[in-house]
Swiss-Prot record:
It holds the Pfam family OTCace_N. It comes from Anaplasma marginale (strain St. Maries). Heterododecamer (2C3:3R2) of six catalytic PyrB chains organized as two trimers (C3), and six regulatory PyrI chains organized as three dimers (R2). InterPro entries: Asp/Orn_carbamoyltranf_P-bd, Asp/Orn_carbamoylTrfase, Asp/Orn_carbamoylTrfase_sf, Asp_carbamoyltransf, Asp_carbamoyltransf_Asp/Orn-bd. Pathway: Pyrimidine metabolism; UMP biosynthesis via de novo pathway; (S)-dihydroorotate from bicarbonate: step 2/3. L-aspartate binds at residues 81, 166, 218. The gene is pyrB. It catalyses: carbamoyl phosphate + L-aspartate = N-carbamoyl-L-aspartate + phosphate + H(+). One of its GO terms (cellular component) is cytosol. This is Aspartate carbamoyltransferase catalytic subunit.
């Protein structure tokens, strides 16, 4: 359908790709697109890191589209016996694999896999703290759907552990490309303001004032090499989005979170249950994964 062979980072997507993916995703949301379009195609989910939403979204999408879907248990594979990624990819290609969905705790490991993939298409489902392109497409589609089809000029506050967040990196790159005013709220020191970001602040109140969109991120302690990050109790005192702080944003603000949420840390129960768009975001994510698979393999 499209000419996209590898989706490793947001920059792999042309504007035409993005628009076509959103059109397809909207059709899947409205149940107007054809299922079974990938009948006979073999897709392997190669996840080196735990996942709930992303893995489920891809597995459900693959099966709904009629593909032969296999999730490789890396802990029980020959990779744990010392087999190289190159040999693993060669084996999968020899077995007729058409597309590999990869998640890794190592940044840019997916690039090495893509180099060894031969004719297999490759999707990055999140690599270390580098990128998560399908989540960025999901978030862009969610915002467009809830904000009248346009993100240009919207104030988007990305709040939390931005330094370790692949979601933040991909969203900053994609949303700024389409004219969003990106603000970053983080307790961490930022020596270099990323391209596309208009404000970096340690104050949640400053960052979310007048915001159209608030995107919350969890603390990713598993990616921290030292223990100098503040405790959850201190973090929640300074950075938890509760109803009082939410009132600083616009009345029609949408609250997003890529998951998993840590209630009582970055988001209060009241905001999570009464003001967030998280479940709609998940629904959009399922449609986006169908759209990406259809676009690349259909």
């Amino acid at each position: 359908m499209g000419n996209l062979k590898k989706l490793l980072r947001v920059s792999d997507l042309s504007d035409e790709d993005v628009e076509n993916l959103l059109i397809l995703a909207n059709k899947y949301m409205a149940q107007e697109a054809s299922d079974e379009v990938l009948r006979g195609k073999v897709i392997v989910n190669l996840f080196f890191e735990s996942s709930t939403r992303t893995l489920l979204a891809f597995e459900i999408a693959e099966k709904a589209l009629g593909a032969i879907s296999v999730t490789l248990n890396v802990a029980m594979s020959s990779i744990c016996k010392g087999e190289s990624i190159s040999d693993t990819m060669s084996t999968m290609a020899a077995m007729g694999t058409d597309l590999v969905v990869v998640r890794s705790d190592q940044s840019c490991m997916v690039d090495e896999i893509a180099k060894r993939a031969g004719d297999c298409l490759v999707i990055n489902a999140g690599d270390g703290n580098h990128e998560h392109p399908t989540q960025a497409i999901t978030d862009y589609a969610t915002i467009r759907s809830l904000k009248g089809g346009e993100v240009r000029g919207l104030k988007v506050a990305i709040c939390g552990d931005v330094f370790h967040s692949r979601v933040a990196r991909s969203n900053i790159r994609l949303l700024s490309r389409y004219g969003a005013d990106i603000r970053v709220v983080t307790p961490m020191r930022v020596d270099h303001v990323p391209d596309g970001v208009s404000l970096v602040t340690r104050s949640l109140e400053e960052g979310i004032e007048g915001a159209d969109v608030i995107m919350l991120l969890r603390i990713q302690r598993e990616r921290m090499t030292n223990g100098d990050f503040m405790l959850d109790k201190e973090y929640s005192r300074l950075y938890m989005l509760d109803e009082k702080r939410l009132s600083l944003a616009k009345d029609d603000v949408i609250v997003m979170h890529p998951g998993p949420m840590n209630r009582g840390v970055e988001i209060s129960d009241e905001v999570a249950d009464n003001h967030s768009s998280v479940l709609f975001q998940v629904k959009v994510g399922a449609a986006v994964r169908k759209a990406v698979l259809h676009y690349m393999l259909g």
